[in-house]
Amino acid sequence: MLAEQENQENVPPAAKAPPPAAGTRVALGLLRGGPARPGPAAQAARNGEGRGAAAGQQQQPFSVYVDEPDEERRRPQRKKERDEEAADAPGLRAALGTVGERRPLAPLGNAMELSLDSPSIMDISITSEAEERPNVNNVPDYVSDIHTYLREMEVKCKPKIGYMKKQPDITNNMRAILVDWLVEVGEEYKLQNETLHLAVNYIDRFLSSMSVLRGKLQLVGTAAMLLASKFEEIYPPEVAEFVYITDDTYNKKQVLRMEHLILKVLSFDLAAPTINQFLTQYFLHQQTNAKVESLSMYLGELTLIDADPYLKYLPSVIAAAAFHLASYTITGQTWPESLCKVTGYTLEHIKPCLMDLHRTYLKAAQHTQQSIREKYKSTKYHAVSLIDAPETLDL
């Protein structure tokens, strides 16, 4: 019985079925198995309407007539239009007659010359030129103020000299290995030299305040390099790249946590003056050749490897010693008077650092860590790491 009712779902109801109750939605009645809504014809049949049609009475067919335009009405209008056109024709002919025949244009006396020298010609073509990176230190009106500011900040951002003695699980040799690895990272991702200098500064300042186990030293270096990249680079590598370079020794969460810890320890003071910045300042005040500049940068980076003895010197002093030694090696010139006036450093001020740097330069080829030396063998830096150090200094 239930199956039969289901099969009768779409069968129209009998003629005598009552109409649907008021208030129910008929559209949902079919879905619920209720009676279908009767059509207008069936409703009229039940109400007794249309009986004449049901009795077989035939209605007369009807036609729709469309009035044709009255031709007689249009004729006077057309005649009036033709009369007006005929009246205007003589005036139009007279107007055309005054113009006369069309004559060719006479050539211009002075033809416009479209030469390359014409100011009306503008070259709007786009030429691709190598854009030089602007030097933020090269502001003549503020050079003195910038140098004074850097000298003040280098004292505030200086790491503690003997912090490694208080580290229970790491040594200067481990730090040297870490910095050497960061040099390779910088070359791999084509980072700025300033990024490397900043990262080493962050590491030394962090280790001056926090004890670190040797298993976490690389994590500190990775997070410091990440911070320096964000501070200095236009397009810093992603965090995943820094996780990758550690051979997945640490995960992304660990790197970000260490980055957060370094920021807290450094009190978010990331704009630390570096040797690289002071060298840039010196190059602006004392013009020199590209080889001297590259050798100065090479000597400055060599001091990043060894915490002892270079942590006891300010970056401005190390930069002065590097400039003097590079200039002496290439050109035979010593500390110039122009830089003496700008920095206030005499040769006696930089002499202790200069002696230490000279010893480092002499032993660079025998040093265990060779990444910096390999870096400066390239033509980009004029292969200055292959230049032999002078045996003695004329001080």
Curated annotation (Swiss-Prot):
InterPro entries listed in its UniProt record: Cyclin, Cyclin-A_N, Cyclin-like_dom, Cyclin-like_sf, Cyclin_A/B-like, Cyclin_C-dom, Cyclin_N, Cyclins_cyclin-box
Biological process according to GO: cell cycle G1/S phase transition; cell division; G1/S transition of mitotic cell cycle; G2/M transition of mitotic cell cycle
Low complexity composition-biased segments: 27-60
Quaternary structure and interacting proteins, as annotated: Interacts with the CDK1 and CDK2 protein kinases to form serine/threonine kinase holoenzyme complexes.
Principal localisation: nucleus
PANTHER family reported for this sequence: CYCLINS (PTHR10177)
Gene Ontology molecular function: any one: cyclin-dependent protein serine/threonine kinase regulator activity
Pfam families, per database record: Cyclin_C, Cyclin_N, Cyclin_N2
Keywords annotated in UniProt: Cell cycle, Cell division, Cyclin, Cytoplasm, Mitosis, Nucleus
Subcellular location: Nucleus; Cytoplasm
Gene Ontology annotations for the cellular component aspect, listed alphabetically: cyclin A2-CDK2 complex; cyclin-dependent protein kinase holoenzyme complex; cytoplasm; microtubule organizing center; nucleoplasm; nucleus
Function: Cyclin which controls both the G1/S and the G2/M transition phases of the cell cycle. Functions through the formation of specific serine/threonine kinase holoenzyme complexes with the cyclin-dependent protein kinases CDK1 and CDK2. The cyclin subunit confers the substrate specificity of these complexes and differentially interacts with and activates CDK1 and CDK2 throughout the cell cycle.
Lineage of producing organism: Eukaryota, Metazoa, Chordata, Craniata, Vertebrata
Protein name: Cyclin-A2
Similarity section: Belongs to the cyclin family. Cyclin AB subfamily.
Region named Disordered: 1-93
